[in-house]
Amino acid sequence: MAAAMDVDTPSGTNSGAGKKRFEVKKWNAVALWAWDIVVDNCAICRNHIMDLCIECQANQASATSEECTVAWGVCNHAFHFHCISRWLKTRQVCPLDNREWEFQKYGH
């Protein structure tokens, strides 16, 4: 439970010197988050980047969301790790900007 908060009154008022204007009894904070990427979909399989890739969807019995991670390149493009790995078997470039692919990070 949050502690009571003292609130200063404006210096020009004389109403109730020393009294609190209000007291916070309870505060329920809410926070939201989002990935810091512009594109929400994997450009290779077209699924949402936070959903399973098409390979994991086909093998849903054995796949978990922990296994289907996101991979970022130094170009800041993001793909499912399985999708970009399959792509890199034939071409060593980013599918979106054609620059040489280099992993920046991967994982959730």
Curated annotation (Swiss-Prot):
Zinc fingers typed RING-type, residue spans: 53-98
Binding site for Zn(2+) 1: C42, C45, H80, C83
Organism of this sequence: Homo sapiens (Human)
Cited InterPro entries: RING-box_E3_Ubiquitin_Ligase, Znf_RING, Znf_RING/FYVE/PHD, Znf_RING_H2
Family recorded in the similarity comment: Belongs to the RING-box family.
Lineage: Eukaryota, Metazoa, Chordata, Craniata, Vertebrata
GO biological processes: cellular response to amino acid stimulus; cellular response to chemical stress; cellular response to oxidative stress; cellular response to UV; DNA damage response; MAPK cascade; negative regulation of canonical Wnt signaling pathway; negative regulation of insulin receptor signaling pathway
Record's subunit section: Component of multiple Cul1-RING E3 ubiquitin-protein ligase complexes commonly known as SCF (SKP1-CUL1-F-box) complexes, consisting of CUL1, SKP1, RBX1 and a variable F-box domain-containing protein. Part of a SCF(SKP2) complex consisting of CUL1, RBX1, SKP1 and SKP2. Part of a SCF(FBXO3) complex consisting of CUL1, FBXO3, RBX1 and SKP1; this complex interacts with PML via FBXO3. Component of the SCF(Cyclin F) complex consisting of CUL1, RBX1, SKP1 and CCNF. Identified in a SCF E3 ubiquitin ligase complex together with HINT1 and CDC34.
EC number(s) recorded for this UniProt protein: 2.3.2.27, 2.3.2.32
Top-level taxon in the UniProt lineage: Eukaryota
Annotated Zn(2+) 3 binding sites: C75, H77, C94, D97
Pathway: Protein modification; protein ubiquitination; Protein modification; protein neddylation
Record PTM N-acetylmethionine, positions in chain: M1
Enzyme class of the recorded protein, top EC level: transferase
Key words of the record: Acetylation, Cytoplasm, DNA damage, DNA repair, Host-virus interaction, Metal-binding, Nucleus, Phosphoprotein, Transferase, Ubl conjugation pathway, Zinc, Zinc-finger
Domains (record comment): The RING-type zinc finger domain is essential for ubiquitin ligase activity. It coordinates an additional third zinc ion.
CDD domains: mRING-H2-C3H2C2D_RBX1 (cd16485)
The name this protein goes by in its record: E3 ubiquitin-protein ligase RBX1
One MF term in the entry's GO annotations: zinc ion binding
Catalytic activity from the UniProt record: S-ubiquitinyl-[E2 ubiquitin-conjugating enzyme]-L-cysteine + [acceptor protein]-L-lysine = [E2 ubiquitin-conjugating enzyme]-L-cysteine + N(6)-ubiquitinyl-[acceptor protein]-L-lysine; S-[NEDD8-protein]-yl-[E2 NEDD8-conjugating enzyme]-L-cysteine + [cullin]-L-lysine = [E2 NEDD8-conjugating enzyme]-L-cysteine + N(6)-[NEDD8-protein]-yl-[cullin]-L-lysine
